[in-house]
From Swiss-Prot:
Organism of provenance: Escherichia coli O9:H4 (strain HS)
Pathway named in the protein's UniProt entry: Cofactor biosynthesis; biotin biosynthesis
Any single biological process term in GO: biotin biosynthetic process
Name of the protein in its database record: 8-amino-7-oxononanoate synthase
Function in brief: Catalyzes the decarboxylative condensation of pimeloyl-[acyl-carrier protein] and L-alanine to produce 8-amino-7-oxononanoate (AON), [acyl-carrier protein], and carbon dioxide.
Keyword flag Transferase: yes
Length: 384
């Protein structure tokens, strides 16, 4: 089989399964409204959970800092790309979340890959929730360590896997809020079992940070858990992009020596770091509390209105509210129907989710209004 035959076969298989991914160029993709092909849609596909991507205070911070620092960092943080803006953001994140250190990364994917690649050796074992993000599972499968997956949120199964003899160290990996189902991990129970077996816990809280907990401190703070490694990302609750790893000073020093994604990548622009500092200030303020309260009210309104729909509603109190349809083609048809009625919704299909669980992944944000939720419910009930 030639290279072209191999590529064609893979694409044909995706098409046949109604699983071919496509991108749509949009004029505006974050916030309350999505604009595409000169049409405006209510946007129920964005991760901009607090509606901060268009916050004037954050935009102003980026603009002013671009004038001061320029639009790029100029290099890796190990060469010339670590600015006073990066340092200030790291210090503020560490203080906010109760850690000694924070290290910035260009994306959550890079942060997860870097930590696992740097920390895990052949004699070690990773025990991961089987519904963990692709960045975590891919890094675990590519690492030299043994990978074992426990049944989603099943602490008993996790304990059984941890009890199996391991010549090296064990790392338990999970998410705070799961990206496709929107449900939360029982972090306190997971940490207890992990500590009983002398393991370390790594939590990716991409979808909880900024959105839940006191001052938006996220899933771990809410459940009174402090994992050895906490990954937070800035493309969701913060409304910007990038990520950080929170850890002890010793682990931070170790990652600065061995995390190749950090060492060999150009740092985020200093102006971006300043915008993130402005976003963090909003998240921690009374305005941040108000946005979280508004989002919670919108979620409650939505869940009350979909109880009688012929879909499986995930057990989610988060901004991620998937309606599990099952069949790929039906999910695509429903997404298209919603778009025709002015609601932009994305159909998520295997391999992103398990076979037979294709879904409409609806996301709500603090930028929405109650009438937006009512309109979505109207369309879902076939009255649009």
């Amino acid at each position: 089989m030639s290279w072209q035959d191999k590529i064609n076969a893979a694409l044909d298989a995706r098409r046949a399964a109604d699983a071919l991914r496509r991108r749509y160029p949009v004029a505006q993709g974050a916030g309350r409204w999505l604009v595409a092909d000169d049409r405006q849609y209510l946007n129920f596909s964005s991760n901009d959970y607090l509606g901060l991507s268009h916050h004037p205070q954050i935009i102003r911070a980026w603009k002013q800092s671009a004038e001061q620092f320029g639009v790029g960092s100029g290099g890796s943080g190990h060469v010339s790309g670590y600015s006073v803006a990066h340092q200030a953001l790291e210090e503020e994140l560490a203080e906010w979340l109760g850690y000694s250190r924070a290290l910035l990364f260009i994306s959550g994917f890079a942060a997860n890959q870097a930590v696992i690649a740097a920390m895990m050796a052949k004699e070690d074992r990773i025990v991961a929730d089987r519904l963990s993000h692709a960045s975590l599972l891919e890094a675990a499968s590519l690492s030299p360590s043994q990978l074992r997956r426990f049944v989603h949120n099943d602490v008993t199964h996790l304990a059984r896997l941890l009890a199996s003899p391991c010549p090296g160290q064990q790392m338990v990996v999970t998410e705070g809020v799961f990206s496709m189902d929107g449900d939360s991990a029982p972090l306190a129970e997971i940490q207890q079992v992990t500590q009983q077996h002398n393991g370390w816990l790594m939590v990716d809280d991409a979808h909880g940070t900024g959105v839940i907990g006191e001052q938006g401190r996220g899933s771990c703070w809410l459940q009174k858990v402090k994992p050895e490694l906490l990954v937070v990302t800035f493309g969701k609750g913060f409304g910007v992009s990038g990520a950080a790893v929170l850890c002890s000073s010793t682990v931070a020093d170790y990652l600065l020596q061995f995390a190749r994604h950090l060492i060999y990548s150009t740092s985020m622009p200093p102006a971006q770091a300043q915008a993130l500092r402005a976003s963090l200030a909003v998240i921690r303020s009374d305005e941040g509390d108000a946005r979280r309260e508004k989002l919670a009210a919108l979620i409650t309104r939505f869940r009350a209105g979909v109880q009688d729909l012929p879909f499986t509603l995930a057990d989610s109190c988060s901004a991620i509210q998937p309606l599990i349809v099952g069949d790929n083609s039906r999910a695509l048809q429903l997404a298209e129907k919603l778009r025709q009625q002015g609601c932009w919704v994305t159909a998520i299909r295997p391999p992103t989710v398990p076979a037979g669980t294709a879904r409409l992944r609806l996301t709500l944000t603090a930028a929405h209004e109650m009438q937006d939720i009512d309109r979505l419910l109207e369309v879902l009930h076939g009255n649009g």
